[in-house]
Amino acid sequence: MMLNLVVADGPRQLSAREKAAKLKKSGLSFAQRKALREEEKKNAWKKEQGGITTTIEDRMKRREQDNPPVRPKPYDKPYEKKPYEKKPFEKKPYEKKSYDKPVASKPVEETDEEKYQRLMEGGKRPEKERWVPQRNFRNRRDMEKAGKDQSQDATPKHHDRDVIGTREDGSLIRRIREKTGAKGGIKGTYVSSIFSEKKEDRIAGEDVQMEDEEEEEAENNAESSNAALKDSTTFSGLGCSQRLVDALVGMQLAKPTKIQRATIPRLIQRERDLFVQAQTGSGKTLAFVLPVLERIMSCDDVSRETGLFAVILTPTRELTTQIYSVLETLCRKACPWIVPGIVIGGEKKKSEKARIRKGVNILVATPGRLADHFDNTEALDLSQVRWVVLDEGDRLMELGFEETITKILRTIEWKSVLRGENYLKDIPKNLKPLPSRRVTVLCSATMKGGVTELGKSTLKDADWVSNDSVEDALAETSVETFSAPSQLVQEWVVVPAKLRLVTLLGALRGDILQSSEKTNTKVIVFLSCSDSVDFHFDVLSRDGSQINKMDTAKTAPLLLDDVSTSVYKLHGSLSQQARTATLASFAKNSTPSILLCTDVASRGLDLPKITHVIEYDPPFSIEDHLHRVGRTARAGQDGRALLFLLPGAEEGYVEKLKQSQQMKKTTYENILAAGFGGKGWDFAATNYHLDVERWVLGDETALDRARRGFTSHIRAYATHIAAEKDMFNVRMLHLGHLAKSFALREAPGKLGKKKDPEKIKVNKDGSLDETQARKKMLDRSRKHVYNSGESAMGGYVLE
């Protein structure tokens, strides 16, 4: 639509402003006016282009002008269509495929002598196999089915049995034996056989042969029925999926241990309670973790919201953290949809509740904190719990968790979906691969009375697995029959009290210098009390720098000049955060590392690559000794352990230890010579001890640590069990020489605080008697009051 304005001089083209005003007054809508403007612009553009081609011929001409045809090249040849020639069909010989099966056999002709020789050697009858091609199948199932049917149809109904004793072969053998050899006749004559030729006897012989073949076939079938367990040297042979096997290979765990080979198939294939008794370092953690993960991985649509399937209870926070670390690594590498969780004392309960609220599938916990969550955390759903694992059962009983564990098991049983007659209807279909009943696993290194009672109250119709045979294991009801790993080398040394400190330093330096791989040397030193740990940590790490800003980890520049060494300390008085960080740093450190600790690190912890264990203070029982030395020589690796003893009655302690293990004696002279450089080791050791004494005298904090370490060591020494009081009697100690081992130059009676020390007195039975010291101090204070009053009143005291 064109809008033109007519004037006196004739029509003229309107300007843009005039056109806009005209359109606005026309009464058209905004959309209509916009369409008119667009149409006008389009017509103007077409006019500038010289018009619009309206016919097909014009368009074709313009296309040819824009795209001229390509001129043929001189080397281009026109395409010539050849007539079809029918070729005669040529039948090619069939090539045997891998899936083809023989359908018929043609026996090879042989003479009587050849057949006799073959039967005597036990060979099979040679045959020529004929193969037929298989048709094209849609899938592998049809191919296998067709091959099976074809092979069954092609089996000959009547065939000769190639076994000595049949009708044809037996007669042939008899004829050849009678005709030739030592039993043959003269000049080709026959010697009559003494065996019967009756038909009944011959049939009976054939029946016996058939029975032998049936028994052999049954034995072969019995071996193949458990083919999954035939290769028990690998995790896949035990029933673990390939995802778990790959994750274990990534963790440098390629072969299972003996206890794992006995435990994993039982927990995967059966639904019975299990008691696992094995020595320390045998791999009990993976023995119950892998079956739980394998069964959960077999379920479909499992996520953190599906529910809690397994609860693992441990006695200590460190062991709980260790098991959780193993679980978290396996789940991250093999099954990231399975979520583990951890609840322990010392952590924020609010954070634990948040993790439980999000959902966990496997929960590792200490009994006390878990019982607290049972009472106060409503989001903790226990309806789908299928496994309850009690690790370190003997330690759980020692710490008094029996009542708490009973409460936990009752709560789980009460809230479980597996209760009632119609419980199977309440189980989701995707959880059918899980056990249909709750499975309880009790793991322990020893069989003490408390563990036996715990097993009776928690296990029902349980199997029992041990490293030893069942007959030997049934007799293991005491710690005397409990042995340390065979690859562990144990030594003991008698050291005078005043040489204990320098001998410890010599042993540490010798272990690091003589180790085949100095960078991987890790030593654990066990002491009797936390104050002693703090003192020796300060001695070894003085002038050292902190590691990762931790107060429990420092470098030890004075220990060795040419080797960078790190020193850590660990005891129960530290906070949970400090203990966890210390263990993690000690485990990951690639330089030579020394961990000074109490018995808090002697149970359950699987610290990697511990090469040496030093028992600087004797253990409080033989069981504690076995758990201490069990920190090394784990999972088949080599390890060494050294026990320090004082001269005299303590030497009899070795006879008790030798009842269950082998120990050899060494001398402190050899240890000092190896640690302080051969010749002149006595002067070097003396100079080092004097240097420590000067440092203690010059530092008030170090002096206080030394005093506290000495007094705490005496108190701890008096806590040995009554059966060992004859060997560890406090009254037999030389307190002056023992104070020397703590770099103290004061007499034992002056080791109290400031001017009024508390003297250490011992009863006849070896226990500490503090009442006498308190009485003397009270008398001294009264005497002081009396003297002060007498001087004030001129020598007289008022009544």
Swiss-Prot record:
<dbReference type="GO" id="GO:0003723">
    <property type="term" value="F:RNA binding"/>
</dbReference>
<dbReference type="GO" id="GO:0005524">
    <property type="term" value="F:ATP binding"/>
</dbReference>
<dbReference type="InterPro" id="IPR014001">
    <property type="entry name" value="Helicase_ATP-bd"/>
</dbReference>
<keyword id="KW-0067">ATP-binding</keyword>
<keyword id="KW-0698">rRNA processing</keyword>
<feature type="binding site">
    <location>
        <begin position="306"/>
        <end position="313"/>
    </location>
    <ligand>
        <name>ATP</name>
    </ligand>
</feature>
<feature type="compositionally biased region" description="Basic and acidic residues">
    <location>
        <begin position="35"/>
        <end position="49"/>
    </location>
</feature>
<feature type="compositionally biased region" description="Basic and acidic residues">
    <location>
        <begin position="139"/>
        <end position="172"/>
    </location>
</feature>
<feature type="compositionally biased region" description="Basic and acidic residues">
    <location>
        <begin position="73"/>
        <end position="100"/>
    </location>
</feature>
<feature type="region of interest" description="Disordered">
    <location>
        <begin position="34"/>
        <end position="177"/>
    </location>
</feature>
<protein>
    <recommendedName>
        <fullName>ATP-dependent RNA helicase DBP7</fullName>
        <ecNumber>3.6.4.13</ecNumber>
    </recommendedName>
</protein>
<keyword id="KW-0694">RNA-binding</keyword>
<dbReference type="InterPro" id="IPR001650">
    <property type="entry name" value="Helicase_C-like"/>
</dbReference>
<dbReference type="GO" id="GO:0042254">
    <property type="term" value="P:ribosome biogenesis"/>
</dbReference>
<feature type="short sequence motif" description="Q motif">
    <location>
        <begin position="233"/>
        <end position="261"/>
    </location>
</feature>
<dbReference type="GO" id="GO:0016887">
    <property type="term" value="F:ATP hydrolysis activity"/>
</dbReference>
<comment type="function">
    <text>ATP-binding RNA helicase involved in the biogenesis of 60S ribosomal subunits and is required for the normal formation of 25S and 5.8S rRNAs.</text>
</comment>
<keyword id="KW-0547">Nucleotide-binding</keyword>
<feature type="compositionally biased region" description="Basic and acidic residues">
    <location>
        <begin position="114"/>
        <end position="132"/>
    </location>
</feature>
<feature type="compositionally biased region" description="Acidic residues">
    <location>
        <begin position="208"/>
        <end position="220"/>
    </location>
</feature>
<dbReference type="Pfam" id="PF00271">
    <property type="entry name" value="Helicase_C"/>
</dbReference>
<feature type="region of interest" description="Disordered">
    <location>
        <begin position="201"/>
        <end position="229"/>
    </location>
</feature>
<dbReference type="InterPro" id="IPR025313">
    <property type="entry name" value="SPB4-like_CTE"/>
</dbReference>
<dbReference type="Pfam" id="PF00270">
    <property type="entry name" value="DEAD"/>
</dbReference>
<feature type="region of interest" description="Disordered">
    <location>
        <begin position="750"/>
        <end position="799"/>
    </location>
</feature>
<keyword id="KW-0347">Helicase</keyword>
<keyword id="KW-0378">Hydrolase</keyword>
<feature type="domain" description="Helicase ATP-binding">
    <location>
        <begin position="265"/>
        <end position="465"/>
    </location>
</feature>
<feature type="compositionally biased region" description="Basic and acidic residues">
    <location>
        <begin position="56"/>
        <end position="66"/>
    </location>
</feature>
<feature type="short sequence motif" description="DEAD box">
    <location>
        <begin position="391"/>
        <end position="394"/>
    </location>
</feature>
<comment type="similarity">
    <text>Belongs to the DEAD box helicase family. DDX31/DBP7 subfamily.</text>
</comment>
<dbReference type="Pfam" id="PF13959">
    <property type="entry name" value="CTE_SPB4"/>
</dbReference>
<dbReference type="GO" id="GO:0005730">
    <property type="term" value="C:nucleolus"/>
</dbReference>
<dbReference type="InterPro" id="IPR027417">
    <property type="entry name" value="P-loop_NTPase"/>
</dbReference>
<feature type="binding site">
    <location>
        <begin position="278"/>
        <end position="285"/>
    </location>
    <ligand>
        <name>ATP</name>
    </ligand>
</feature>
<dbReference type="GO" id="GO:0003724">
    <property type="term" value="F:RNA helicase activity"/>
</dbReference>
<feature type="compositionally biased region" description="Basic and acidic residues">
    <location>
        <begin position="754"/>
        <end position="780"/>
    </location>
</feature>
<feature type="domain" description="Helicase C-terminal">
    <location>
        <begin position="511"/>
        <end position="679"/>
    </location>
</feature>
<dbReference type="GO" id="GO:0006364">
    <property type="term" value="P:rRNA processing"/>
</dbReference>
<keyword id="KW-0539">Nucleus</keyword>
<dbReference type="InterPro" id="IPR011545">
    <property type="entry name" value="DEAD/DEAH_box_helicase_dom"/>
</dbReference>
<keyword id="KW-0690">Ribosome biogenesis</keyword>
